[in-house]
């Protein structure tokens, strides 16, 4: 019985620790950072602003509890694994 209880305690601690380790790439620094508890999605949001033709699309990366809602003229994608939202310019081709 004590072995079973000890096993359950160890499994609980491991699971709680893993729950806090979800990470996504975040802007403006485009580096992997831990997400807040409950935020288990990474998102990438891109759009054109007044300077789109000279510098390219604006890119926002971050964590979310739910995928951000659609917005006019903005592309939004979400994924649910660690660091699954790399900056498009940093992806291997």
Swiss-Prot record:
Pfam families linked to this entry: Toxin_cobra-type (PF21947)
Signal peptide as annotated in the record: 1-21
The keyword GTP-binding belongs to this UniProt entry's keyword annotation: no
Molecular functions (GO terms): acetylcholine receptor inhibitor activity; ion channel regulator activity; toxin activity
Function: Binds with high affinity to muscular (alpha-1/CHRNA1) and neuronal (alpha-7/CHRNA7) nicotinic acetylcholine receptor (nAChR) and inhibits acetylcholine from binding to the receptor, thereby impairing neuromuscular and neuronal transmission.
Cysteine pairings via disulfide bonds: 24-42, 35-63, 48-52, 67-78, 79-84
Top-level taxon: Eukaryota
UniProt-recorded name of the protein: Long neurotoxin 1
Family matches, as SUPFAM superfamilies: Snake toxin-like (SSF57302)
GO cellular component, one term: extracellular region
Upper lineage: Eukaryota, Metazoa, Chordata, Craniata, Vertebrata
Protein's cellular compartments: Secreted
Family under the similarity heading: Belongs to the three-finger toxin family. Long-chain subfamily. Type II alpha-neurotoxin sub-subfamily.
Swiss-Prot/TrEMBL keywords: Acetylcholine receptor inhibiting toxin, Disulfide bond, Ion channel impairing toxin, Neurotoxin, Postsynaptic neurotoxin, Secreted, Signal, Toxin
UniProt source species: Tropidechis carinatus
Tissues where this protein is expressed: Expressed by the venom gland.
Main location: secreted
């Amino acid at each position: 019985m004590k072995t079973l209880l000890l096993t359950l305690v160890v499994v609980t601690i491991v699971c709680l620790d893993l729950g806090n380790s979800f990470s996504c790439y975040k802007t403006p620094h485009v580096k992997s950072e831990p997400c807040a508890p409950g935020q288990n999605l990474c998102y990438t949001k891109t759009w054109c602003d007044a300077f789109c033709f000279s510098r390219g699309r604006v890119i926002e990366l971050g964590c979310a509890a739910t995928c951000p809602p659609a917005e006019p003229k903005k592309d939004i994608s979400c994924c649910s694994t660690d660091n699954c939202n790399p900056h498009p310019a940093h992806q291997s081709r």
